[in-house]
């Protein structure tokens, strides 16, 4: 029988230490996304969108982090939504149905504008929340 190497013992210890945190992040994110998913189904509104995954990770993995504060999360995503609506309106796409297959110059310009406005506004207002850049 081989003796455990210090590296292997160290990895085992780290796994034991990380397990409760991993379980917390898993459970809290599943519950929070399930609540939003249920609200989306009941209200027939898109309450679940891709940038919420990284937001949930920040909130549950590093709740005291600079990007995890309620102000940054709410303001960041709010800026992303507002920038998205503004960009769609600027390029005449506000009342156009969603189209994930046909990219036009208008859609590309709206996306570029939206991301730029979102990121710039978060810096200007000092509410950095990286996942909000994907809310656009």
Model-flagged regions — what are they?
Residues 78, 124, 130-131:
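Alpha-helical architecture
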Residues 48-53, 129-135:
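Transmembrane helix boundary and interhelical junction motifs in multipass membrane proteins
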Residues 1-96, 102-112, 118-121:
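Alpha-helical transmembrane segments and their membrane-interface boundaries
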Residues 88, 122-126, 135-136:
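Generic transmembrane alpha-helix signature in multi-pass membrane proteins
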